[in-house]
Amino acid sequence: MQGTKINDLYEYLSNGHEVSFSYRGDDYSMEPDGDAFTIWKYGNNSKCICRYEIPESCDTKSAIHDFLNAKCFNGQSFMEIEQDVVVVIIY
């Protein structure tokens, strides 16, 4: 991943920051959303490609781990594609 490190990504998400990134020419946003984490794909037909509901009994670090390992990118997780990700902006 270019633009940040995975440990920093955990920190950004756990502190409520939105992370914009590109992957294979497409633009995405990863963000905390109340009781969930989401990934949005932007373009002509913007859509939520992943919504991970945080279980009540789950701590934040475990929830982020599970979210980043959800299969959202054509059968692959963020962790599986992260070497091809470029972080653009952290809000």
What positions do the PLM features span?
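Negatively charged, low-complexity tracts enriched in Asp/Glu with abundant Ser/Thr
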Residues: 1-22
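Short, isolated positions in well-ordered beta-strands
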Residues: 28-29
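Short, surface-exposed, low-complexity cationic segments
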Residues: 32-51
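Mixed-charge, Lys/Arg-enriched low-complexity segments
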Residues: 51-91
